[in-house]
Amino acid sequence: MLSSALLCCLVFLGGTGASRGQDTPAENSCIHFPGGLPHMLRELRAAFGRVKTFFQSKDQLNSMLLTESLLEDLKGYLGCQALSEMIQFYLKDVMPQAENHSPAIREHVNSLGENLKTLRLRLRQCHRFLPCENKSKAVEQVKSAFSKLQEEGVYKAMSEFDIFINYIETYMTMKIKS
């Protein structure tokens, strides 16, 4: 009985000693995340490039959906929440509708969505990049304007996706520096 208790203690202590000084895979990926961000943004831009002309040619509106107020929220104390909500907005509201506009672009919009999901997953794994709870007024304005535009909203939101990528880059650059 004493020997099995001693064996359990040794196994436990050996396991904790071996893991001390070794990062978990999630922690390890967070160390390399800033270096991999430019590649992820290039992939997003390349995926968007395959549908950009389609959506921008269909966008006949002169107004902007993604305004400076959204960029200011991303730069401010609500940056984390604004980014999280905007990723969710594109994944849940915009892209499912965008996929249905032409069979020729469905695969490309799907690929763009997968790249955005990968970015969101990495951001969530590295909590310092996405540690948020509050709501962003700018995102609420984007969602409200999108809803009012009805079908035109999809063209508008997708045609401005490159602006969103630039906003992501601005937010992440700030976070990496801090």
UniProtKB/Swiss-Prot annotation:
Where on the tree of life does the source sit, at the highest rank?
Eukaryota
Mark the transmembrane ranges: none
List the carbohydrate attachment sites: N134
Q: Where in the cell is it found?
A: Secreted
Sorted keywords for this record are:
Cytokine, Disulfide bond, Glycoprotein, Secreted, Signal
Disulfide linkage: C30-C126, C80-C132
The keyword Iron is annotated on this UniProt entry: no
Record's signal peptide: 1-18
Protein biosynthesis as UniProt keyword: no
Question: What Pfam family is a match, any one?
Answer: IL10
Q: Which GO terms describe its cellular component?
A: extracellular space
Q: Which SUPFAM superfamilies match?
A: 4-helical cytokines
Per the record, the GO terms for biological process are: immune response; negative regulation of B cell proliferation; negative regulation of cytokine production involved in immune response; negative regulation of inflammatory response; negative regulation of interleukin-6 production; negative regulation of membrane protein ectodomain proteolysis; positive regulation of B cell apoptotic process; positive regulation of cytokine production
MF-aspect GO terms = cytokine activity
Q: Hey, which family's this protein in?
A: Belongs to the IL-10 family.
General function of this protein: Major immune regulatory cytokine that acts on many cells of the immune system where it has profound anti-inflammatory functions, limiting excessive tissue disruption caused by inflammation. Mechanistically, IL10 binds to its heterotetrameric receptor comprising IL10RA and IL10RB leading to JAK1 and STAT2-mediated phosphorylation of STAT3. In turn, STAT3 translocates to the nucleus where it drives expression of anti-inflammatory mediators.
Identification of the protein by name: Interleukin-10
